[in-house]
Amino acid sequence: MNQIRQAPATSASNATESKQEIRNYTMNFGPQHPAAHGVLRLILEMDGETVVRADPHIGLLHRGTEKLAESKPFNQSIGYMDRLDYVSMMCNEHAYVRAIETLIGIQAPERAQYIRTMFDEITRILNHLMWLGSNALDLGAMAVMLYAFREREELMDVYEAISGARMHAAYYRPGGVYRDLPDTMPKYKQSRWHKGKALKRLNAAREGSMLDFLEHFADTFPQRIDEYETLLTDNRIWKQRTVGVGVIEPDVAKAWGMTGVMLRGSGVAWDLRKKQPYAKYDAVDFDIPLGTCGDCYDRYLCRVAEMRESNRIIKQCVQWLKVNPGQVMVENFKVAPPKRESMKDDMEALIHHFKLFSEGYCVPAGETYSAVEAPKGEFGCYLISDGANKPFRVHLRAPGFAHLSSMDAVVRGYMLADVVAMIGTYDLVFGEVDR
């Protein structure tokens, strides 16, 4: 409801003008707005340029993912997880398959655990590069988007090489991963866009295996991050737009259920990879970047520092995987499909494959909650089984939902232009918020 306050007495000669009432006005920010990051509709009550109240409206991307997952066998819903936070695909899969593994009582082989750890961090870098480019673009720094997508394209090639898809990989499976790392990387072919010395430079790191390619990437990525920081970190316009904007105190962040960078940017050292280690995070060395002021600038610095730490983890995983061959799927034929070679000359293997992917498998009755440290925060899957081949209940804990709930409390008192900066540092994706 519009608030009305009497205009202060003035010495204006126009009597009608002095009796005018000053009203707050309502502004619709999104859903068709380039800075809304999807389908966010934010109803802002404005007093001039100052935000008095913010009312986020969600649901425009609701697809009933939880109910869909409850209507299909356990192993047919992995693809739905990719489409929740569609910038952090494999991290979503990780939470879901871990929940299934807990109920069945199986554990992925060590090599598969290292592969999962490595791809979780590749996914984190993919997410943070997308965030960095889009947030900088929202605030007027277009060049950063072009720089960020240069490296992002290399990691998308890794996704495509391992799963056949650039985004929706469906690579993690209960009991391990879909397949081992390939021995070759796809190369660029000569075209109007790639030729001569540029083509040779692009293909130079693709001569060996995927691990060789990732090792080269991990060696060169810190210099690329330095380039991003050259463009932004000490840029006075960037600092004017982010320093002291969107300050979230530690107690406020915890009260709203914030996780991930939104919490660590306020100085709270909470990271599931350290506090509740899963996969092989207890076997790799990395640090947790923390903010001090809890503003947009601190959250920017935390994400940039996280990319450096993710790069460290990838490097350690690559070194381990190079010298430790082994299985990537548990030897439990309840969940593991037969090998492709055996299906070509063994009817039983063919039947096994057909039954596994058409009917799935029954999971022992019970309930569990499995969470991972996704790029945006704690992504969790609460799974209940009644002993059938379909989940009785699937509930997904999306970090963006809790973060968006705090929008009204955080943006009050700031200018309209600051709302764009704050929405950007929230790093919202409505696939997971609306589900």
Curated annotation (Swiss-Prot):
It is found in: Cell inner membrane. One of its GO terms (molecular function) is NADH:ubiquinone reductase (non-electrogenic) activity. It holds the Pfam family Complex1_49kDa. It is a peripheral membrane protein. Its main location: membrane. InterPro entries: NADH_Q_OxRdtase_suD, NADH_UbQ_OxRdtase_49kDa_CS, NDH1_su_D/H, NiFe-Hase_large. Its EC number is 7.1.1.-. Signal peptide: none annotated. Keywords: Cell inner membrane, Cell membrane, Membrane, NAD, Quinone, Translocase, Transport, Ubiquinone. PROSITE patterns: COMPLEX1_49K. It catalyses: a quinone + NADH + 5 H(+)(in) = a quinol + NAD(+) + 4 H(+)(out). One of its GO terms (cellular component) is plasma membrane. Belongs to the complex I 49 kDa subunit family. NDH-1 shuttles electrons from NADH, via FMN and iron-sulfur (Fe-S) centers, to quinones in the respiratory chain. The immediate electron acceptor for the enzyme in this species is believed to be ubiquinone. Couples the redox reaction to proton translocation (for every two electrons transferred, four hydrogen ions are translocated across the cytoplasmic membrane), and thus conserves the redox energy in a proton gradient. NDH-1 is composed of 14 different subunits. Subunits NuoB, C, D, E, F, and G constitute the peripheral sector of the complex. This is NADH-quinone oxidoreductase subunit D. It comes from Xylella fastidiosa (strain 9a5c). The lineage of its organism: Bacteria, Pseudomonadati, Pseudomonadota, Gammaproteobacteria, Lysobacterales.
